[in-house]
């Protein structure tokens, strides 16, 4: 086994990478509140895993979406557990994201030279809220339908571009199959990809600049 490890280590310098990760200096002022960002990331991983599992059974059509969710909850082995994990980790992700933003703001973690880290964090916060908005509609029940209708109707108040923006979000004049397809694509592909990219940038900047000092 050691020969296999040595072979990879000679080519990839695994030991050096491991030493760098495990020997990073942690300032003495760091407390449990500095772990909230990591909890948010953990919730995201749970979302990805449970959401991926549900894509095998969910059908993104206005006629079958609700029935497919019921099927997941009642007929799929541990489907109720997977969807419950997805639901509660989503709520936890939003909560911990808000707490993380407050912690960073109150401790001055947004100040020079960490402005870009703050910017990527704000973008991730927007992605998190967008996950909630798009995911809420996917069961396509009465609550989801009317939530989509209200949310997509908000831009209509914007002068000039309001109406075209509403039509772009809905995929037409009214809320229907095109709307559900758009929200499903955003929820399962676009937003996870954007979140992963900005999380990577966020983590790399934290790794490079370290944890901000005390007030």
Curated annotation (Swiss-Prot):
Binding site for heme b 1: 100, 202
Pfam families cross-referenced by the UniProt entry: Cytochrome_B
GO-annotated molecular function: electron transporter, transferring electrons within cytochrome b6/f complex of photosystem II activity; metal ion binding; oxidoreductase activity
InterPro entries: Cyt_b/b6_N, Cyt_B6_PetB, Cytb/b6-like_sf, Cytochrome_b_N_euk/bac, Di-haem_cyt_TM
Topological category with respect to the lipid bilayer: Multi-pass membrane protein
Bound cofactor: record note: Binds 2 heme b groups non-covalently with two histidine residues as axial ligands.
Transmembrane segments: 32-52, 90-110, 116-136, 186-206
Superkingdom field: Eukaryota
Cofactor: heme b; heme c
Main location (coarse class): plastid
A GO CC annotation given for this chain: chloroplast thylakoid membrane
Family matches, as SUPFAM superfamilies: Transmembrane di-heme cytochromes
Subcellular location: Plastid, Chloroplast thylakoid membrane
GO biological process, one term: photosynthesis
Keywords, in A-Z order: Chloroplast, Electron transport, Heme, Iron, Membrane, Metal-binding, Photosynthesis, Plastid, Thylakoid, Transmembrane, Transmembrane helix, Transport
Binding-site list for heme b 2: 86, 187
Function: Component of the cytochrome b6-f complex, which mediates electron transfer between photosystem II (PSII) and photosystem I (PSI), cyclic electron flow around PSI, and state transitions.
Subunit structure: The 4 large subunits of the cytochrome b6-f complex are cytochrome b6, subunit IV (17 kDa polypeptide, PetD), cytochrome f and the Rieske protein, while the 4 small subunits are PetG, PetL, PetM and PetN. The complex functions as a dimer.
Additional note from the record: Heme 1 (or BH or b566) is high-potential and absorbs at about 566 nm, and heme 2 (or BL or b562) is low-potential and absorbs at about 562 nm.
Family membership noted in the UniProt record: Belongs to the cytochrome b family. PetB subfamily.
Full protein name: Cytochrome b6
Organism: Mesostigma viride
Name of the gene: petB
